[in-house]
Amino acid sequence: MSVNVKDFGAIGDGIADDSPAIQKALDSGSTIVEIPEGNYRIVTTLKVSSFTRIEAAKNARIFSCGDTPKHQGDLLLTNSDFERGNTQISICGGIWDGNNTGKFNTKNPDLFAPDAWSGTVLNFFNVANLVLEDFVIANSVVYYARFGKINNFVIHNIGFQSDFPGFNQDGLHFSGYCRNGLIENVSALTKGQTNDDMLALNADDSMERLENRGLLRGPIENLTFRNVFAEDCYTAIRMLSVTAPIRNIRFENIRCGCRNYAINMDAARYCRTPLFDAKDYPKGVGDISNIVIDGMEVWKTSERDVPLIVNETNSENIIVRNFRRVMERDKCPEVPTIVTQNTIPLATSFRNELFQ
C-alpha cells in the first residue's frame, strides 16, 4: 500500500511548512510513502517508523528550514524509536538537504552547550535492516549522516554535495554497535567535499560533544565498503579506536584525493577533545583488527606536511593490496605515504608496491 505526501497536504513550493503533512503520511501505516518532485521545507524533525519505505523523486528536495532556532535532537530525518528500535526502514531517492546557509542552521561554537543541536542531516540509531539508496545528501552543517547501533544494513549510490564547506562535515559517520553492513558507490559530488572524514568509523569518540550526543562507544564490525570516490576530500577514511574494537572491515576500490589523510588512525590524539592521556597508556591505545584494503588510489590535494596514512593505534592483521599513490596528481610528493608511531609492533602486510 502506497500513499503520496501531497494527498496529506504537502505543497512542495519551498515556502510552506511541509513537515506536518509528510509526518502524517509517514504515520498513516502505509508501507510506501511517495514524495514527488518539489521543494519541501521541513521545520520539525521527520520520524520514520518500522516497515516504511520512502520513495522520493530524483529532484524532490527535502530541506531543513533555516528560519527556526535549532535545539538538541533536531534533525532533518531520523528513525522514530531509539529505545525499542526500528526495523525495515528504506529510503530511496531525493535530495536531503541540511540547508547550511539558513540563518539558524549553524554549529554552536560551544561544543558542549547543553541544548546545542548536532547539525546532522540524517540520523539512524537502533535500526535493523536499514536500506538507503539512490539519493543525495546536501549542505550539511556537521555530519551528512550518522549511525549508531545498526545491524544488517545496505547503503548504496549515495552522493554528497555542498555549496559551502562546514566544520566536522563527515560523510557517513558510524559510531558504536554498527554491524553487518554493505556500503557501496559513495561519491563526493562537489569538489572539496567531504570537509572532514568521508567515511568515519568511530568506535570511540567524545560523546559529550554536540555532534555525537545520542550515539554510543562500542564495537564496529563486519562492514564492507566499495567504490568510494572523492576528488578533494579532507580525509577519506578514519578508524578511531581507544578501547572499543573495530574488526572485520573490508575496503575495495577507494579512489580519493585527500587534503589531509587517506587513512587516519591517530586515535584522536590531536583532536580539540582528546579521548585519553597518553601517560596513562604507555603501551598505546586501540583495538583494530582484520582489516583488508584492496584497491586504493590516493593523492595529496594540498601541501600540508602530513603522511597519507597515519597509524598511531594498536592493530593487527591489516592487509593492504593494490595500493597506488598517484604521484602525477600529488601536490606534496615528498611527504611519506605511511607513518606508524606510538604503538606496539604492528602486524601489517603490504602487498604490491606503494608507489606505481
Residue ranges and their predicted role:
Residues M1-Q356:
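Extracellular/periplasmic carbohydrate-active domains that bind, remodel
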